Amino acid sequence: MNDTWRSRLKEISHITADPFLRDFHKLHTNDKEQIYSILHNPDNVVEQTFKNTIIKSMEESMFRPLIPTQQMKRRQNDHHNQGPPPKVQKSTVDSLKSQHQIDQQNLDWFLSQPLEDLEVMTVPEQYPLTVPAVLPLAELYYLTQTLASIKLLPGSHKVLMTENFESALAEGKIAVLYSRIEELKRQGKWSLRQPQKFYDPFKFIRKSKKKSFHWDYLLQEGKWMADDFRESSKYKKWCCVVIAEAVEQYWKGRKVSHQTFVDVADLKKIDKSIIRNLPVYTGLGGDSREPPIATVSKLVYPAEDNHWYKIALKPHHHHHRHQTTHQGLFGSTRKYNTLKPPKPPTPKNIEYRIPTIWLPEDDKRLIHYVAEFCFNWDLISEHISSSSTAVSLKKYESNIERRTPWQCFERYIQLNDKFQFSDMKGVYAYHAQQWLEQAHRAQSTTKRRISPLGVGPESVQRGNRKLRWASMFDAMRKAMKKREIAAAKVNHRKSTAELQANQNVTEPKPNSDRIPTPAELSRLKFERDKTLHENHINQQATRARMVQAVAKPAPAPAPAPPPPPPPKPVKRPTTPNGTPLTNEQIQHLLQMQKHRRMLQQQQQQQQQQQHQQQQRRIHFPPAQVSKVINDIQQQNPGLSKDQVTKLAAQYLASLSQQGYGVPSSPVPPHQKNQTASPMSGSPNNA
């Protein structure tokens, strides 16, 4: 082989040793067999060698930090010089330790412990030994908003891996998820259990372009059921065969005796150890073990798991149950108890409120019921009232012993030293706060106690009975006063109603419930317009006469005829004080006088009409009225009873206006055409 081929082979070996040309000294292998193998080996072997070399160099370059060119040259020169290895300077600070030292110390501590105090576990290699910190979703959202990885990645000075970008994408997903959850919570659409979304089978199949429908799936399940029934019948037959074979074997071999127990001495050493470790089933003892949450089969490793396992050492806890401070989702403890106040009474006359008296037994009972019923003040009030201290007074309950829901709440917050207004939540929280503040102001200004009063047994024996009787008499006095006020109101209302009835006897009240007809409304409108028009004309005439009387000069006396007697001067109307009236007042006075005259004329006309009607009115006897009705019914048999009655009334009214009565004999033929003509019409004319 000449030098040209040898140099080319060295270049190829250099490429295989350093594909990315990171070695500036152009090193190559000196192994002649490896160089000649490139020539003698097949092409696929040489190609695979190149691939492996390139992959190995890529893996090394990915985890190798970026080193400047000058520093890399210096390191390679130092490596070629092969000087003495540098000494590693150890830190003089005891608190600074490397990770290797910490791991070694932990291992030494575990090895020094006795085996009874350790738990040796085999864990898959990919599982971490320590559980990572679990952060709530709100904290993760806060971290993604303050220190977002997507903002830190562009300015990073280190090599970025795929895991870094995946964590940044996961943070973005967490932010979107948290914001969506909070939005659903505000709308009241978020629950702990999300139901599966319903898909319409026909729409879903049409979108996914499937050819199978619900009926196809139903037929497929029917085939499965048929196969299942067929196999179940085969299984039953097989069970019968097994039982028959067992019975046959029993009757054939019952003369031969078999040993029903095992002698431990005949067993091997391994079998003896297995029997020795078998659990012994005895009666129930005092030491009971809590069943695990997961099944036992989940603790057994799969038989076909070929992954590597690592050994983990853990301190052994001798107590059976692990006491933890973390509560589950439906735990009994809460962060804080929400205090929901009941509906407060009205703050009217709050300064006259009588304080309630609470004994030590009542306070204990109140605290017990509050813890039992969890601030359900209605139930608390019922239970405390049923077991009240007033034994002798069963039908009467004084104000100082009354136990309403609000009084129970007021006494509870008085016993609670750590109570704050911010602890109250619910519908009546604001109203309760306003009531308590107003009661405190009234108590400080009036110097009178309003809040509940807690007393001891010695104070109860002295004054409780007097306070009870005083409260009873006070309640009786208030009840009597209320009755007197109610009776006085009723009597005053009756006297006022009687006086109004006496005044309005002559004035009949119009029927306010009756709705006027359109004809009546049009008539009233016509009368109103007519009255207004007449008043306007009268005002203009009166104004013209007054202007003529005031402004027109007196005519000169004629020389021929003798002078008439001088007319009396027209005096201008004045007030009782002598002040002359203005033109507007005079017009108003004239209008009132005219209106009074018109009313007098209308009354006179009405009286005259009533007098004339009384004179013209003719009283018909019942026999004549019935005779007229019968005649009309005979002449018009097709009319109804109401129509016949109306025709008879019209006929009698026309007779009364003409001034003569009904003849005693039947109506003659020549008068029938004159008088009975309105009765012989059709019902439509009637």
Curated annotation (Swiss-Prot):
Compositional bias (Polar residues): 497-506, 574-588, 671-686
Domain HSA: 202-280
Comp. bias intervals (Low complexity): 599-613
Protein's name in the database: Chromatin modification-related protein EAF1
Gene: VID21
Keyword Transcription: yes
Species of the source: Candida albicans (strain SC5314 / ATCC MYA-2876) (Yeast)
GO terms (BP aspect): chromatin remodeling; DNA repair
Principal subcellular localization: nucleus
UniProt-listed PROSITE patterns: HSA, MYB_LIKE
GO cellular component: NuA4 histone acetyltransferase complex; nucleus
Role description: Component of the NuA4 histone acetyltransferase complex which is involved in transcriptional activation of selected genes principally by acetylation of nucleosomal histone H4 and H2A. The NuA4 complex is also involved in DNA repair.
Cellular location(s): Nucleus
Domain of life per record: Eukaryota
Subunit structure: Component of the NuA4 histone acetyltransferase complex.
